[in-house]
Amino acid sequence: MNEEIGFLKNQLFADVKDLERKKKRRVPPEQRRRVFRACKHCRQKKIKCNGGQPCISCKTLNIECVYAQKSQNKTLSREYLEELSERQLCLEYIFSRMCPNFNLETKNLISISKKLSENENLPVSKIAEVTNELDTLVRINDQLSRNHISGTTEEMQSSSSLIAGEVQPGISFRDQLKVGKLEDTLYLGPTTSEAFIERLQNELELESISEDDLYSKRLSPSVSYSEFDEQLLLHARSLIPSKAVVEFLINSFFINVQTNLFVYHPHFFKCRLEIFLAMENQIDAGFLCILLMVLAFGNQYTAEQQEDVSKSNFHASNIGNRLFSAALSIFPLVLLQSDVSAVQSSLLIGLYLQSTIYEKSSFAYFGLAIKFAVALGLHKNSDDPSLTQNSKELRNRLLWSVFCIDRFVSMTTGRRPSIPLECISIPYPVILPDLEIPGSQSIVENMRAVINLAKLTNEICDSLYWNPSPSFESQVNSVRRIYARLELWKSDLHSSVVFDESAVQHPLFRSNAHVQMIYDNAIMLTTRVIMVKKLKDKDLTAENRRYIQLCVESATRVINIAHLLLTHKCLSSLSFFGLHVPFASAPILLLSLHYENSQDIQAVVTKLWQVLEFLSSRCEFARESLNYLKSFNKQLSRRNAPDINNPIADFQNSFQNWQSWVGDMSHGDMLSTFKLTGESSNGSNSTPNEAFQPFDQTSSLYNVPGLNKSYVSNQPSLLTPETFLPDPVLNLEVDKQWTAPTFLSWTELLGPTNVSEQSSHTAEQTSNLTLEKNG
């Protein structure tokens, strides 16, 4: 017994010693760097080797320096082991989903691998059966648990199928787009009862109900007009001018108004107009409303180009407003039709109202256009053969135009967009030969460019304005990312969309100018966040200063383009982009003018006022915005100008420079260079401006030796006598024989009392001295 205890003690002692020996060894032999660094000669001599080729010792002895080859069994890195661990966990998780109750031990995995290697053609669905055969205990437990829950064979089979890993397809409902005989559409979402009934019909293999009987009234509702409605329609129809005038106004609309946004195809519109004019008994309220709005736009654009436009009653009495009022009166009848004409009418009315005093109502009509587009299913792609390829393309162009208006109105008003991008499944507009007008340039590439800019604008508003990051560094990262995407958009721009200032006669000159203005507006919207940071913190990085420079350059480019359009009579307040983008660039240029005041900025601001004055003379909204900008400009001017009405405050801001200036004058005896008026005058009281006046021009101060010019350069207004208000109370005289006064601190100058009391006391004393001397 004692021998066994002694053996155990010796063994425990040896184990403890071995453990201590392992702890003392700090670096394992296989990880020591010296193992492969020393050459064979240094190893044999047991001397230090520097690992060179050759080493210093071998080079000195002039012998061959040979190193032992490294072992190919490299030690696995820690990162690789961690990656293997993650891979193992992922594979175990995947296998557990396929075979939930399989025991993932090494011996079981080896067994199932051998079993699967015997039958390479075994399908995947049979793997679960093989695993159950290998693990009998698990299979028995599953059988007992299933019998405990339910003893029926069907439930046992369903449960075994679930355990086998067969994925059951989910139950889904699809949205539908019903098409009528006249290509009228009706959108039914996946939550509607019709979608549920259709799913039941498919599952029960029932015959589908005829859509002609089910949706005929909902697709093409028959509208019956009352006597009052018919009178409204007849009155609106009577306002249509002669055919020659109609053609002129229609061409003016499609050339000048419908540029980057699509409302109606010109060829189809003229064909529909001929049919409408030929049928006097039947009046289509939808097309009549669109026709009146097109004529109103054409008339207003023609009237805008006249130079003798009255600012007061431009929108009060003209033919365009009468046409617009007639279209607005029959618009409720258009809503009852619930077809594409409701979308087009709402869009045109909203565009027209933005240049009037009812600018806020225009956003409501834009919202109606969006809601009607969704109700008609314009945002969903349809495979129905009833819709021709041309009809699908026209619907796609109209929806994308509504989408762009929604995004840009969202940016202008600050509200969130109404159509989520995820809900739109239609493709981009494409060029179809049947829809192209011979001799005219296609606007499809312009539309695609504007659509991409609308998406980027929404991303800008979402990341920088609606959901801003609390950290400025994160905001700079967002600016960097968005700016990179804008540059990518610019590099991918089609050559026909690139704006050329010299190509004034190009058919898409105005459209390309608007695309460039939208791009510059996106740059301003992205980078003006950093411009606000500059007002708070002037120590910015070079990258942030570059972004501020880009902001100013974009605003400058917008005004130059707008002024170019104004010069060639292409600028219009009826254009959404031509109206809002110049006003968006105005605050940036005014801020740059008052902080930099360079000649280039002054020239651009001069063009800015010309553009805004033109828009304000033709638009009520622009007139109010211009007055607001003028007030902002006055505030900036008052902030940067010296406060001449408060000499104490002005003296506080420049007291230190003034002290150094007086000190330089006292040391250099500069008092003799000034003309002193007092005794040499007629003995009348003199103001400080008269008593202390330079004998020559103000520039002579710069030539005086020893004068501190920092004060002169920083405060140029102090050298101009006209900038100071004369004070009849403070009458001071300076004697030539007096020496310069010693410096006084600011507290000694003002004294412990109030500044106003001290100034009044000083004024009283000086007035008494003056009276005594004159008396």
From Swiss-Prot:
Its keywords, alphabetically, are: Activator, DNA-binding, Metal-binding, Nucleus, Phosphoprotein, Transcription, Transcription regulation, Zinc
Is Zinc given among the entry's keywords?
yes
Q: Where is this region: Disordered?
A: 676-695, 754-775
In the record, which positions carry Phosphoserine? 208
A single GO cellular-component term on record: nucleus
Q: Which SUPFAM superfamilies does this one have?
A: Zn2/Cys6 DNA-binding domain
Q: Name one GO biological process term.
A: DNA-templated transcription
The highest taxon in the source lineage is Eukaryota
Q: What is any Pfam family matched here?
A: Zn_clus
According to the entry, DNA is bound by residues in 39-65
Q: Where is coiled-coil annotated?
A: none
Q: Which GO terms describe its molecular function?
A: DNA-binding transcription activator activity, RNA polymerase II-specific; DNA-binding transcription factor activity, RNA polymerase II-specific; RNA polymerase II cis-regulatory region sequence-specific DNA binding; sequence-specific DNA binding; zinc ion binding
List locations, semicolon-separated.
Answer: Nucleus
InterPro entries reported for this sequence: Stress_Response_Reg, Transcription_factor_dom_fun, Zn2-C6_fun-type_DNA-bd_sf, Zn2Cys6_DnaBD
Function of this protein? Answer: Transcription factor that activates the nmt1 promoter. Regulation of thiamine repressible genes. Positively regulates conjugation during meiosis.
What name does this protein carry? Answer: Thiamine repressible genes regulatory protein thi1
**Organism of provenance:** Schizosaccharomyces pombe (strain 972 / ATCC 24843)
